[in-house]
């Protein structure tokens, strides 16, 4: 039995759960960042005189950075290792948030959002993969859901901090706080985050065996562990091209479509709900509270998905969540005139959509072999970020052109069902391995 098989089939120990927690904290930073921009929207737009379309483009600037980060940094992680690229990504994010705090023009803020997004994109890929690789088969879905729950918790705290810091200081303080938290996380990761076991086995860099055994002892697995037999390098110049081989083509394209649709819906809900509810008659505080309820539901929904998917097929549970999310989005917007109902339904919408994201993060790494896993995961997340880039901008343009919020939310619910269809036709990981 090699170390990979030992991890797959053994109970998860303290260090493995610590790795999952570190990944969750990194995802927490993504959640903080997304809700920080959503909840500072009113003051930023007022300071810089931005229209809805212009603010949507500002939000999209950060998301463009995420697309580039997930697609460009992911292949580098397959080549140089998950750990160094994760550390680089966290550093980018910290610097970007600090520059956001110092921004005096919308152009500087847009640049800082791209830089932050670049880091977040790299973080998302690395954390998803490393969580999957250090989890046992039994607890993998739940571990990924714990990691995914970090986003909802970060979003909720981001909303709370945005609310209090803007009241006491200004919107700039929100980004300074984010930069400080990210810098602390960088130090923690530098000390405790290990390299990927699968990377060490697949690429076998210098001192790979010694590093493998050092990690094994931290995991509580005594003895001398050998590297697995190194597979012959495939005649592929770029791991990206392998995603379109006969083995992976269908699953790659359907995964991309699923990510695009679900992330489009998620970022529309996250970015626009507080502002639209305020325009509909809620106070700023009430609209932010509903936004935080969506985030609170998100944290719970990720965990609920993980528990259910530990018992049944991860893909089937994900399809069920997409259908339920579509229905919940429509019911939410039709009931938004009542604050109490809106807050309750906000929790439900947040839970279901974040459960969908947990599902994507669960089935995505299992689709690809270790030598191209980071690339496969990164490009799928990048496709999702393309949806998230379009969501705020398209929504802003449609609102400026006269669409009402009910029509817009119903259209978004329809986009969610596209993911349901794509997932229905995607090959299972067992079918892919047999190919």
Map each language-model feature to its residues.
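Helix-loop-helix hairpin linking two adjacent transmembrane segments in secondary transporters
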Residues: 147, 152-198, 202
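Intracellular cytosolic loops and amphipathic helices of Major Facilitator Superfamily
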Residues: 1-7, 192-247, 251, 433
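C-terminal transmembrane helical hairpin of 12-TM major facilitator-type secondary transporters
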Residues: 309-360
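Paired small-residue
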Residues: 96, 107-115, 340-348
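Extracytoplasmic gate region of multi-pass secondary transporters
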Residues: 37-38, 244-302
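Cytosolic juxtamembrane N-terminal segment immediately preceding the first transmembrane helix
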Residues: 1-32
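Conserved MFS/SLC helix-loop-helix module at the cytosolic interface between two early adjacent transmembrane helices
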Residues: 68-106
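Helix-breaking motifs and short loop linkers at transmembrane-helix boundaries and internal kinks
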Residues: 49, 81, 102-108, 119, ...
């Amino acid at each position: 039995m090699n170390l990979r098989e030992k991890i797959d089939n053994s109970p998860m120990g303290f260090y493995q759960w610590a790795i999952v927690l570190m990944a969750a904290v990194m995802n927490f930073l993504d959640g903080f960042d997304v809700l920080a921009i959503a909840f500072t929207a009113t003051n930023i737009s007022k300071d810089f005189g931005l229209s809805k379309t212009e603010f949507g483009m500002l939000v999209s600037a950060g998301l463009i950075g995420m697309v580039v980060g997930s697609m460009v940094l992911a292949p580098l992680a397959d080549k140089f290792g998950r750990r160094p690229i994760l550390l680089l990504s966290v550093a980018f994010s910290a610097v970007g948030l600090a520059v956001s705090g110092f921004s005096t023009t919308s152009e500087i803020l847009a640049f800082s959002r791209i830089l932050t997004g670049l880091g977040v994109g790299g973080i998302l890929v690395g954390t998803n993969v490393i969580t999957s690789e250090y989890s046992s088969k039994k607890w993998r879905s739940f571990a990924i859901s714990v990691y995914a729950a970090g986003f909802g918790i970060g979003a909720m705290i981001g909303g709370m901090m945005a609310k209090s810091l803007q009241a006491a200081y200004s919107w700039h303080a929100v980004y300074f706080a984010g930069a400080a938290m990210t810098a602390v996380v960088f130090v923690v990761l530098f000390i405790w985050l290990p390299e990927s076991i699968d990377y060490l086995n697949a690429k076998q860099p210098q001192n790979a065996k010694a590093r493998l055994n050092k990690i094994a002892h931290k995991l509580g697995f005594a003895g001398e562990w050998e590297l697995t037999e190194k597979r012959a390098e495939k005649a592929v110049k770029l791991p990206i091209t392998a995603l379109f081989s006969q083995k992976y083509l269908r699953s790659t394209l359907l995964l991309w479509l699923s990510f695009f649709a679900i992330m489009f819906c998620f970022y529309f809900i996250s970015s626009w709900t507080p502002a639209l509810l305020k325009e509909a008659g809620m106070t700023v505080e009430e609209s932010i509270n509903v936004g935080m309820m969506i985030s609170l539901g998100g944290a719970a929904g990720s965990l609920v998905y993980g528990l259910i998917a530990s018992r049944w097929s991860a893909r089937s549970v994900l399809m069920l969540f997409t259908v339920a999310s579509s229905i919940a989005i429509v019911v939410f917007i039709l009931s938004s005139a009542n604050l109490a109902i809106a807050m309750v339904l906000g929790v439900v919408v947040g839970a279901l959509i974040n459960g969908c994201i947990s599902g994507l993060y669960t089935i995505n790494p299992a689709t690809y072999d270790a030598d191209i896993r980071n690339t496969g995961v990164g490009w799928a997340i990048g496709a999702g970020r393309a949806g998230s880039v379009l969501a705020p901008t398209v929504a802003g343009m449609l609102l400026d052109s006269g669409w009402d919020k009910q029509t817009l939310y119903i259209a978004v619910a329809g986009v969610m069902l596209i993911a349901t269809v794509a997932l229905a036709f995607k090959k299972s990981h067992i079918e892919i391995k047999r190919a």
